[in-house]
A protein has these predicted regions:
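Membrane-embedded, hydrophobic transmembrane alpha-helices
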Residues: 1-113
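Specific aromatic-rich, kink-prone transmembrane helix
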Residues: 15-20, 267-284, 297-298
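Transmembrane-helix signature of polytopic, membrane-embedded enzymes
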Residues: 32-39, 209-213, 230-251
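Transmembrane-helix motifs of polytopic, lipid-linked glycan transferases
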Residues: 77-83, 214-237, 274
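Membrane-lumen/periplasm interface segments of specific transmembrane helices
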Residues: 136, 321, 325, 332-361
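Short acidic/glycine- and proline-prone juxtamembrane loop motifs at membrane-interface regions
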Residues: 260-267
């Protein structure tokens, strides 16, 4: 479990924190709080790590494990250096403000009033009681990480992740089959999700560990982020609506079961949902930070699943048609979104369509 905690802290906390630190520097208009940016960024660390690994394996195949592990660390270290030493950034001030926002809870409106605190605690207690009496709760909670990967989709993704790790190339991915193991792809989604297992295997080989605990933790982690995101969005209108909406997610047995199952659904739904929300916010506020977050989440939505890739094309078109600004600015934003979409997820589908399996065509 120590290795799992190390992987989780490094990828989901440290890497996500570096990304959050960079995004906060550009949050000049404060249309979105620094705390909300940090919470959103918790889901970006694993995805960024996966896409970095994708480009490393694509451009530098067949390298030893230490090469990819060190390359990822260097990438984040360079990002941190750029953030710290860029003359236009004031990292110290923004970092202090972020710490204050956690300490004083200035950004959380519902904690400013005693009545709201009581309501929040009551809702938490109710959710806890529901969990405690739910018939299958113990089955899903006890030994969750010790259960083998089971289920059609996740077994496929797990197999792919191990193949990427063993071969250090995407050759079989774009051929559609892997003769050595007899594995044949059943879908043409981007390898973003299975690469998280590849990343765990690479780190584990260096530290003498061979587990898949971190990969298994991805589903509940992004399930929790969905709950946080729903609360964050609905709290703009009403704190009570946010509490009700967050609690309502667990009123469905399907969401609860998905929360404690090995699957890609919550991972891809998180990026799909955030991309749609930031599309609307970008058009409404014309805020630079909202547009940046739209670019990032849209790219990862495409990279996580083919449905996200298809919807991303329509999302870019909607942005261009409904974003009210001078034509030159609309064109600039349009190509910025296209570029980020291509780098973060679209390239895979372009390459697969032209030189690979043909994707969905």
């Amino acid at each position: 479990m120590k290795f799992f905690m190390f992987m989780f802290f490094m990828t989901n906390v440290i890497f996500s924190g570096i990304i959050a630190f960079g995004l906060i520097q550009y949050n000049s208009k404060k249309n979105i709080s620094n705390l909300k940016i940090f919470l959103l960024s918790l889901g970006l660390g694993p995805a960024f790590t996966s896409i970095i690994l994708y480009w490393l394996l694509f451009m530098f195949p067949y390298k030893p494990d230490v090469f990819y592990f060190v390359a990822v660390l260097i990438f984040y270290f360079l990002i941190l250096l750029i953030i710290i030493f860029h003359k236009k950034l004031n990292g110290n001030k923004n970092l202090i403000n972020l710490i204050k926002s956690f300490y004083l809870f200035k950004q959380l409106i519902f904690l400013k009033k005693k009545n709201n605190i009581k309501l929040f605690l009551i809702v938490i207690i109710i959710i806890g009681l529901v969990f405690s009496i739910y018939p299958t709760f113990n089955q899903y909670s006890k030994g969750y990480l010790l259960k083998p990967l089971e289920g059609h989709d996740v077994q496929s993704y797990g197999t792919e992740g191990k193949i990427y790790y063993k071969e250090k190339t995407f050759k079989h991915r774009y051929n559609g089959e892997h003769p050595e193991s007899g594995y044949i792809r059943f879908s043409n989604h981007s390898p973003l999700f299975p690469l998280l297992l590849t990343w765990e295997k690479i780190a584990g080989s260096i530290m003498g560990k061979d587990t898949d605990y971190y990969f298994k933790s991805i589903t509940p982690f992004y399930g929790l982020l969905i709950v946080i995101f729903v609360f964050s969005v609905l709290s703009i209108k009403s704190v009570y609506l946010a509490l009700l909406g967050s609690a309502a997610l667990f009123s469905s047995s399907l969401f609860f079961i998905k929360f404690f199952s090995y699957h890609i659904d919550l991972f891809r739904i998180y990026f799909f949902s955030t991309a749609i929300i930031f599309l609307a916010l970008s058009i409404e506020t014309k805020d630079r930070m909202q547009i940046i977050l739209f670019c990032v989440t849209l790219g990862f939505s495409a990279a996580s699943h083919s449905i996200g890739a298809v919807v991303s094309g329509f999302s870019v078109l909607i942005f261009f048609l409904f974003y009210e600004d001078e034509m030159i600015n609309r064109i600039k934003h349009f190509f910025s979104i296209i570029f980020s979409l291509f780098i973060l997820g679209g390239f895979h589908y372009f390459y697969d369509t032209i030189w690979g399996t043909g994707w969905i065509f």
